[in-house]
Amino acid sequence: MTIKGKATSLDIAHLAGVSQPTVSRALRGSPMVNAETRERILRIARELNYKVDKNASSLRLRNAGTLALLFFEDPTNDDSLINPFFHSMLGSITRACALHGQDLLVSFQQLSTDWQADYEDSNKADGIILLGYGDYHESRDRLQRLVEQGTHFVRWGAALPGQPGVSIGSDNFQGGHDITTHLLQQGCRRIAFLGHASSHYPEFQERYRGHVAALQDHGLASEPALQHDAITTEASGQEACQALLARGEPIDAICAASDLIAIGAMRALREAGLRVPQDVAVTGFDDIPLAASVSPALTTVQQDTKQAGQLLVERLLALIGRQPVDSQSIPVKLVVRESSLHG
């Protein structure tokens, strides 16, 4: 085979029928490339008398001064469907990067299958921040691959047993416990929980566990009929509340796993002719800006996005600097407003 001029990795990729990042990984012996493909790439490289650009390789060993934020969200979705909580997180992370002299590369990752290749092969960033309500159970293999490749990364979310990597997240259990205790102190006893309670939604699951623990502390048992799945959108909260009301189960409060779910639930209650909080008290979780401006203003659990952004950036930079780093849980704060004042 003949190539005009000096052969490049793009030439090898074309002849081997693979991507340029795959060629780069094969040439450096990455285990991500299977043996057959690697041998084909190496054979073509030899035939083309391809030489690795050592100057470019040495540049890749230097810090780029850039961090990558991989956001778990479908880029084809309407912007209005993105939880405003993550807007606050993005702002906090951006400010923290600026304080540390780092640029920030933001990428939607809902449709991605290779987190590392999305940034590393083009030398875009020194490490990754994973952000979103990610199903890290399904992503465990990809997280483990990042560890094995020596990729520096931190993730926002609940610290799960056996989960690879460093996590920074709010104390979701305590938040669920505190807000349910508040409802109980208002005299509520039939408290519904709207939000997924499975391990595929670890943040919601921890909030639900805190909710159940608070009920037990007051001598009450959780009732499966009072838990209804919902994701973090107003529409999902509205639908979940409608389904709950259709069951005919008597309730005097709704503990929602997020503010958006709570706001959707309040709409469903109004449509059903029920008053908030006189008939049904409602609480949320996140303390997004809208929580204070809806009517009635929403009682919620505030997550400290400023501290969260700072910790995510600082821990990632520490990892890049080869320093030991541990996961951390951030305290939350109960914010009482009109929607829960049931008494």
Kindly give the residue locations of the regions a language model identified.
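Short gly/ser/thr-rich secondary-structure transition/capping motifs
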Residues: E47-D53, Q109-T113, M266
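Short hydrophobic segments within beta-strands
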Residues: L70, L130-L131, L194, C255, ...
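Short acidic capping loops at alpha-helix termini that bridge into adjacent secondary structure
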Residues: R190, S222-A225, V276-A281
